[in-house]
């Protein structure tokens, strides 16, 4: 389960890279983005799912629409939503050694993303890799932000938390 620590960390880029790396290691890889998060103006298929399908020939399940997910959450139907997602995940697992699951990205309109990601990871009994990108912050600030997100999934020492991928890293001087 690939979980972002914040908006703009390059989650889809990391997911694509992870799929490619696992394929190169000889594994049969599936991909699953449970919840579509369209960008403003998007009218076609969900971007992550379409990118993986086109670049790797994988046929992931169609993600649930954000409107559908928000309606279910608003109606207190979290358990039913998770069951629906688990059914789709099971489709993604067919014939694969491993499935890369891309979590929700927090936005102004989806501030609940971290909570949903936690429920998804637990329901799928998934191992978690956090993805972060340093903004204009020193390493201690970045470390604190990553550790805070790791706590959501049981803490950095939890065996389900595999680690963190830092994306968009600049030179050492800019991180000092």
Task: Locate predicted features.
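Glycine-rich phosphate/diphosphate-binding loops that line cofactor/substrate pockets in enzymes
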Residues: 89-95, 157-158
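A short, structure-level motif marking secondary-structure boundaries and short turns
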Residues: 2-5, 101-103
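Conserved beta-strand elements of the Class I
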Residues: 1, 30, 127-129
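N-terminal phosphate/diphosphate-binding loop that engages ATP/GTP or pyrophosphate donors
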Residues: 3-92, 108-110
